[in-house]
Swiss-Prot record:
Mn(2+) 1 binds at D299, D310, E471. The keyword Transport does not apply. This is Xaa-Pro dipeptidase. A dipeptide binds at H278, D310, H400, R417. GO terms for molecular function: manganese ion binding; metalloaminopeptidase activity; peptidase activity; proline dipeptidase activity. Its cofactor is Mn(2+). Keywords: Dipeptidase, Hydrolase, Manganese, Metal-binding, Metalloprotease, Protease. It comes from Dictyostelium discoideum. Its EC number is 3.4.13.9. GO terms for biological process: proteolysis. Coiled coil: none annotated. InterPro entries: Aminopep_P_N (IPR007865), Creatin/AminoP/Spt16_N (IPR029149), Creatinase/aminopeptidase-like (IPR036005), Pept_M24 (IPR000994), X-Pro_dipept-like (IPR052433).
C-alpha cells in the first residue's frame, strides 16, 4: 500500500482495518496517498489546555474539577427523515478528535488530563441501517482516551469523583456574533457547581496557536487545495460554466487526496461575479458562463480531518492578462508580497491591513484611476471602496477560526476579523483584494467629499473586471512566516506560462 510521503517512517496502520474504516488504533487515515493523522494530536491538545488552565488559574481551580464538553447533535433536515452529513462541533473535535454525534467529553483538571469520552447507547436497529455498533473498547483504542462511558453513565461518574466544579464553554464567536451553547444535560446544574466563564478564552486561545501536528494536517489541506486549484486553472476555458470549475475542484480533492468535504461553499466567480465577495451561495450558485474577457476569482479550500485550507486564485479565463487586468492584479500581488515580507511575531495585524491598503491605493493612483494625495485617500477611507474586507483571518478547524478578538487584541476594527499581534504558531490567511463593486462606487461617487478622488474616464475602463483577490495560508514562525500555499503560480508571468502549457 502506497503511503503519503509525510507518513514515511511512521508506524503503519493495519491494512485490513482500512478496508472497513478510516480509523485504526490511534490514527485517522484513508489509505493510499492520504495523510495518516496520529490522534495523539488531540491528547496533546487536552494536555496543552489543562496545563494552560492550571498555570494561569491554579488558585481558582479546586481539586476534582473537570471540563465538560458536548459534541454536535445529530439532526434531520427540517421535518424530513433525511439526516444531513454530520460535521462535528469544533471545540469538541479539537479536544477529542471524535466525529461521533450526541456525545459528551470529560477532561480532568489534573496533571494527567484524564479523559473520558461519553458515547450514546445505540439501539439494535442502528446496526441494520447505519452499520456495526462499536464497543467502548474500540473507541478507547481509537481516540486514545482513558475511559469510554455511555452518556447515561456520565452523571454517576462525576458523582463518584466528587466533582467540585464543572467548567463549560460559554462565549460569543466574534465572526458570527453567535453565542456558544453550553452542554445541556438533565440535572447537571442542580447537582454540580458549574463555571461557564473560565474555559472559553482558554480553549479558544489554545486553538489560536497550532501544534506541530495540527500544522501538518493544515499543510496537507493546503497541498490538496493547491493541487486542485492548479488542476482547475488548466481546465478553465471560455464557455465553461462556473459550476463545472467547482466540480473539478471537488472531484480532485476527494479522488486524489481523500478530502470528502471542503471548508466552505466554493466561490467560483467569473466575469463581474468576481466582485461579489461571497459568491457561490444558493442565490448565486456558480451558474454563469465564463465569457471571452472573463476574469476568474476562485476561492476554494479542501478539508481533511476537520481542518481546512482557504485559498483564492485570480486569473484571466484566456490565460492572458489584458492591460487593465494586469494593473489590478499587480496591485494586489504587490500588496500580498509586501505583507508576507513584513509578517513576523510582534507585528500588528492592523498594520498589515493598512500596508496592503496603501499598496493597492498607490497602484490605483499610478494607473490614474484615482487622483490626489495618498494620505488624503486613506483619511477619506477610499481604500474600503476597493478593499472592503479585512486582510485575513485565523485558519484551522474553522475557516474563520476562533480567537480573533482575544488576548492582546486592539478594539474591533470594521471588517477586520482580528486586530491581534502576530505570534509564532498562528495560521492566518493573507488575502488582499481589489474590487469594482457597483454599489460601493456609486456611494463614493455620489458624495462630493469622496467623488473628487476618482478619474471617471479611467475608472470606466476597469469596472468590468469585477475583482481580484490573492489568498494564501500563512504560518507565523519564530523568525518570519511560511507561505504554505507558495507552490501556486502567482506572478503574471507564472500564471500565463502555466495556463498556456
Amino acid at each position: 500500500m502506497s503511503v503519503h510521503p509525510r507518513n514515511q517512517g511512521k508506524d503503519d496502520c493495519c491494512e485490513k482495518t482500512h478496508l472497513d474504516s478510516q480509523y485504526s488504533p490511534g490514527y485517522y487515515w484513508l489509505g493510499n496517498n492520504t495523510l495518516k493523522v496520529p490522534l495523539v494530536l488531540h491528547k496533546e491538545n487536552r494536555q496543552r489546555l489543562v496545563s494552560q488552565i492550571l498555570s494561569k488559574h491554579k488558585d481558582q481551580v479546586k481539586e476534582n474539577s473537570f471540563i465538560l464538553l458536548e459534541s454536535g447533535k445529530s439532526t434531520m433536515q427540517y421535518d424530513t427523515d433525511h439526516e444531513p452529513l454530520f460535521k462535528q462541533e469544533r471545540y469538541f473535535f479539537w479536544t477529542f478528535g471524535s466525529d461521533i454525534p450526541d456525545c459528551f467529553g470529560i477532561v480532568g483538571l489534573d496533571e494527567q488530563a484524564t479523559s473520558i469520552l461519553c458515547i450514546p447507547k445505540l439501539p439494535a436497529e442502528y446496526a441494520t441501517w447505519m452499520g456495526e455498533i462499536r464497543s467502548k473498547e474500540y473507541y478507547k483504542s481509537i481516540f486514545l482516551v482513558d475511559q469510554v462511558l455511555y452518556v447515561d453513565e456520565m452523571m454517576d461518574y462525576l458523582k463518584s469523583k466528587n466533582a467540585s466544579t464543572i467548567y463549560t464553554i460559554l462565549g460569543t464567536n466574534t465572526d458570527s456574533g453567535s453565542t456558544f451553547v453550553e452542554p445541556q444535560y438533565p440535572g447537571l446544574r442542580e447537582t454540580f457547581n458549574v463555571n461557564n466563564t473560565l474555559l472559553f478564552p482558554e480553549i479558544a486561545e489554545c486553538r489560536v496557536i497550532k501544534s506541530p501536528k495540527e500544522v501538518e494536517v493544515i499543510r496537507y489541506c493546503v497541498d490538496a487545495s493547491v493541487s486542485a486549484h492548479k488542476h482547475v486553472m488548466r481546465k478553465v476555458k471560455v464557455g465553461l460554466k462556473e459550476y463545472q470549475c467547482e466540480s473539478e475542484f471537488l472531484h480532485h480533492v476527494y479522488n486524489e487526496w481523500g478530502c470528502r468535504n471542503v471548508g466552505y461553499t466554493c466561490i467560483c466567480a467569473a466575469n463581474k461575479n468576481s466582485a461579489v465577495l461571497h459568491y457561490g451561495h444558493a442565490g448565486e450558485p456558480n451558474s454563469a458562463t465564463i465569457s471571452e474577457n472573463g476574469f476568474c476569482l476562485f476561492d476554494m479550500g479542501a478539508e481533511y480531518h476537520s481542518y481546512t485550507a482557504d485559498i483564492t486564485c485570480s486569473f484571466p479565463a484566456t490565460g492572458k492578462f489584458s492591460p487593465e487586468q494586469r494593473v489590478v492584479y499587480q496591485a494586489v500581488l504587490d500588496a500580498s508580497v509586501a505583507v508576507m515580507e513584513a509578517m513576523r511575531p510582534g507585528v500588528s495585524w492592523v498594520d498589515m491591513h493598512k500596508l496592503a491598503e496603501r499598496c493597492i491605493l498607490a497602484a490605483l493612483l499610478k494607473a490614474g484611476i484615482l487622483v490626489g494625495d495618498l494620505q488624503d485617500l486613506i483619511a477619506n477611507k477610499i481604500g474600503s471602496v476597493f478593499f472592503p474586507h479585512g486582510l485575513g483571518h485565523f485558519l484551522g478547524l474553522d475557516t474563520h477560526d476562533v480567537g480573533g478578538y482575544l488576548g492582546d487584541c486592539q478594539p474591533k476594527v470594521h471588517s477586520l476579523r482580528t486586530t491581534r499581534t502576530l505570534k509564532a504558531g498562528m495560521v492566518i490567511t493573507s488575502e488582499p483584494g481589489c474590487y469594482f463593486i457597483n454599489h460601493l462606487l456609486t456611494q463614493a461617487l455620489s458624495n462630493p467629499e469622496t467623488a473628487k478622488f476618482f478619474n471617471l474616464t479611467e475608472l470606466d475602463k476597469y469596472r468590468n473586471i469585477g475583482g481580484v483577490r490573492i489568498e494564501d495560508d500563512i504560518l507565523v514562525t519564530e523568525t518570519g512566516c511560511d507561505n504554505l500555499s507558495k507552490n501556486l503560480p502567482r506572478t503574471i508571468d507564472e500564471i500565463e506560462a502555466f495556463m498556456l502549457k
